[in-house]
From Swiss-Prot:
Function: Required for polyglutamylation of axonemal tubulin. Plays a role in anterograde intraflagellar transport (IFT), the process by which cilia precursors are transported from the base of the cilium to the site of their incorporation at the tip.
Compartment(s) where it occurs, according to its Swiss-Prot or TrEMBL record: Cell projection, Cilium
Record-linked PROSITE patterns: TPR_REGION
Protein's UniProt keywords contain rRNA-binding: no
Coiled-coil intervals: 507-534
Record-given protein name: Intraflagellar transport protein 70A1
Gene this protein is translated from: Ift70a1
Biological process terms in GO annotation: intraciliary anterograde transport
Protein species of origin: Mus musculus (Mouse)
Length: 664
């Protein structure tokens, strides 16, 4: 039963009813009763105190702080209300206000708690020297007997947090592990340890601690509905309860998703996010919202941009939000938007962007208007990074000579991080010449970087592409495509369809037809096996391979064979016709129509009839298939009636009739 107002509570039972609601965690109902009562008796200390407590439990920290402020004004002799006000302001991320209130507390009994709170505020503000000074004061025992020592669990956690923020992840791991052993299992502490392992790239122990948090959370709180959403079960939101917060389940699932994303297990990362306890979208925390945006960007880019833009207006927001939004704007070529966001948020630039990331974004934005200038900027950045890579290579060699495993590990991690910065710079340089179709220059850029990148999959893939595009280097392209395919041969559908298609074409162009046929049989076999488990699933790999081969023959002028191959590749239409496959098919038809209209080729009636019949099938099956995937933030949308395969296939059919002079 929900209590709407205090008038409905029987006489003499108001206090009992309120305490019963609080006992049952029905804080919203308790707030309704207490608010109504306080309208009649605004100076009730008990009422205000209970209302503040309920607001705090509901995570309405600003409202809780207002109540505690009133209480401290009404009862200045009771300093605990000022302490509670400061704690609520800290939880509301109002750090300057919280700091001001802590300075008003001078009761020695609260000295330790005040110092801890001040240290937490400094830490959250990013003032690490200030936070460390206060933590060391606590550890020294200056704040009193209850301030703990160096081996006290709280002290270990505080030092671990500081070490983590300072980038000393392994030292932080040691502190968190010691705290865990001293205090016994605690979900939040186990999460801290997992996070420190993650940041030091030790994913296996991080996942072990995450699994422990999730397993205990499921066992102790089955009511939180872990995994229900992924299984398609319609469940109610569990809300942002104190119990949910205490389990650290949300944090654990977010960290697991981040690890899977880093390991390029994108589907597992997406499932991990849906495995977490169900909450309504308005209840989601900033980290979950950020991760949802990032991990579903390919499928829902518009929604992803909206979420990241929304987060940028919040205080606080995950520190990665600003950089990720700018990088995604550049990825989707919204350079003007990226420039606007940088200009409007200069204060965030210095706080959230490293000098490397700022310089990289600046060069990417410059690419739009001054590609030559952008190339020079990127070249400067690449030069700086190659110097770092050479220095680290030398460090690793010296450490190996001295058999110093610790230095080897540290230098190797730093080398990997620097290489991950270098690759995007290199690719951005190459893209400038790629857009100009100057493929020899792209190849030259890649060859200059072979010293560092020859084992990097992204580099190898792009070298293969640029060799393939030069048309006289198919044999060299095979040398780069083949290892990528063979590495994933047992799960060949995990390889991009265009990579498989380009490898098949390269085989054909170098008279290795048997290898091409064997690869296509392997793809066909895997597609068949996959369709047994999910008959309705659309799989495009073999279709795209055949389309690219058909396109090759069309490009060589053999339209009879090429168009026939394109048509057959899309059968059956209900499983093979999609936006991507239609893109390849219509290019061949447009090329055919162009050459027919110039009277450069003549098709026999049988092939023309085959083309018309194919387009009629596309018209039938393409009603709900977009002809073009529009850019997520495009202001001028294509008319929905025109952006379908059905519309475009009708248009192509009409053009065929017009070119050959048939009457419709």
């Amino acid at each position: 039963m929900a209590w709407q107002s205090s008038s409905k509570v029987p006489d003499g039972e108001f206090t009992a009813v309120v305490y019963r609601l609080i006992r049952d965690s029905r804080y919203s109902e308790a707030v309704q009763l207490l608010s109504a009562e306080l309208q009649r008796s605004s100076r009730s200390r008990a009422g205000l105190s209970l209302l503040a407590y309920c607001y705090y439990r509901l995570q309405e920290f600003e409202l809780a702080a207002e109540c505690y402020e009133q209480l401290s004004q009404m009862h200045p002799e009771l300093e605990q209300y000022r302490l509670y006000q400061a704690q609520a302001l800290y939880k509301a991320c109002l750090y300057p206000e919280a700091t001001r209130v802590t300075f008003l507390l001078d009761n020695p009994a609260y000295q330790t708690r005040v110092l801890r709170l001040q240290a937490a505020i400094k830490y959250s503000e990013g003032d690490l020297p200030g936070a460390r000074s206060l933590v060391e004061q606590l550890l020294s025992g200056e704040a009193g007997e209850d301030s703990g020592g160096e081996n006290d669990p709280d002290g270990l956690v505080n030092m671990g947090c500081l070490l983590y923020k300072e980038g000393h992840y392994e030292a932080a791991c040691s502190k968190f592990l010691a705290a865990l052993q001293a205090s016994g299992y605690q979900p939040d502490l186990s999460y801290n340890l997992a996070l420190a392992y993650y940041s030091s790239r030790q994913y296996a122990p991080a996942l072990k601690h995450i699994a422990d948090i999730i397993e205990r959370g499921i066992r102790q709180h089955p009511e939180l509905g872990v995994g229900m959403t992924t299984e398609g079960i319609d469940v109610r939101s569990v809300g942002n309860t104190v119990v949910l917060h205490q389990t650290a389940l949300i944090e654990a699932f977010n960290l697991k998703a981040a690890i899977e994303y880093q390991l390029r297990n994108f589907e597992v990362a997406q499932e991990t996010l849906t495995d977490m306890p169900p909450r309504a979208e308005e209840e989601l925390d900033p980290v979950t919202l950020h991760n949802q945006a990032l991990m579903n960007m390919d499928a829902k880019p518009t929604e992803g941009f909206e979420k990241l833009q929304f987060l940028l207006q919040q205080n606080p927001f995950p520190p990665e939000t600003f950089g990720n939004l700018l990088l995604l704007y550049c990825k989707y070529e919204y350079f003007d938007l990226a420039a606007d966001v940088l200009a409007e948020n200069a204060h965030l630039t210095y706080k959230f962007l490293t000098p490397y990331l700022y310089d990289f974004l600046d060069a990417m934005i410059t690419c739009q208007t001054a590609p030559e200038e952008a190339f020079i900027k990127l070249d400067g950045l690449a030069g700086m990074l190659t110097e770092q890579l050479r220095r680290l290579t030398k460090q690793v060699q010296e450490a190996r000579h001295n058999r110093d495993d610790e230095i080897i590990k540290k230098a190797m991690n730093e080398y990997d991080e620097t290489l991950e910065k270098y690759i995007p710079v290199l690719m951005a340089q190459a893209k400038i010449y790629w857009n100009l179709e100057n493929y020899p220059m792209v190849e030259k850029i890649f060859r200059k970087s072979v010293e560092f990148c020859n084992d990097h999959d992204v580099w190898k893939l792009n070298v293969a592409h640029v060799l393939f595009m030069q048309e006289n280097k198919y044999k060299e392209a095979i040398g780069f495509y083949e290892p990528i395919v063979k590495k994933n041969y047992d799960n060949i559908l995990s390889v991009s369809a265009i990579v498989l298609a380009n490898l098949c074409v390269s085989y054909i162009m170098t008279s290795q037809n048997e290898e091409a046929e064997e690869l296509m049989r392997k793809i066909e076999k895997e597609e068949e096996q996959l369709s047994y488990g999910d008959p309705d699933k659309k799989i495009y790999h073999l279709c795209i391979v055949n389309l690219v081969i058909g396109t090759l023959y069309c490009a060589k002028g053999n339209y009879d064979f090429g168009i026939s191959r394109v048509i057959k590749s899309l059968e059956p239409y209900h499983k093979k016709l999609g936006t991507d496959t239609w893109y390849y098919a219509k290019r061949c038809f447009l090329s055919l129509l162009e050459n027919m209209s110039k009277h450069m080729i003549v098709l026999c009636d049988g092939v023309v009839q085959e083309c018309v019949q194919f387009l009629e099938y596309c018209e039938l099956y393409g009603r709900n298939i977009p002809a073009v995937l529009e850019q997520p933030l495009e202001e001028e949308r294509i008319h929905t009636g025109k952006n379908t395969v059905t519309y475009e296939s009708r248009l192509l059919k009409a053009l065929i009739y017009e070119v050959i002079g048939w009457n419709m």
